[in-house]
């Protein structure tokens, strides 16, 4: 971790956070977004949709507060991950409203690069474009998965950090230092 603290000087400017489900990846992303407001981050995170105490889907929450359904047990169609139907058209429409490449944006944020999100070819292209852009990408990525999930982990321009309960606070400080 003896890397420079400026993203511009890092050969690996893209930061991927992985870890077991429920370890706190989204919470870490949200804390980093709060600390890095000066970079005017653009992107989204994913939150559970719960009904009567049971998880029934996932929603997308833009850093600007907008929301859209990503998946739900009641969505029918060809795109399914487990018991959830994925609303690929709605996801694509949501993504197109986020100005990831706006001039004032200094950080792209994606939570997460996972199986549901990868149902969208638009999302897969967006991730490659963000990784190859001159702006840093801060993203969570599923621990397991093929295709894009595996591909992004092999790129030379990424640094992968595995989040564990023991490393939560330390990783928050390290990533704040690298990205600010």
PLM features: residue spans?
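Phosphate-binding P-loop
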Residues: 2-12
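Hydrophobic anchor at the beta1->P-loop junction of P-loop NTPases
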Residues: 17
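P-loop (Walker A) phosphate-binding loop of NTP-binding proteins
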Residues: 20
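Conserved lysine of the Walker
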Residues: 25
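Hydrophobic positions on the alpha1 helix immediately C-terminal to the Walker A/P-loop
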Residues: 28, 32
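N-terminal phosphate/diphosphate-binding loop that engages ATP/GTP or pyrophosphate donors
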Residues: 33-81
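Phosphate-binding/switch loop-helix module in NTP-utilizing enzymes
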Residues: 78-129
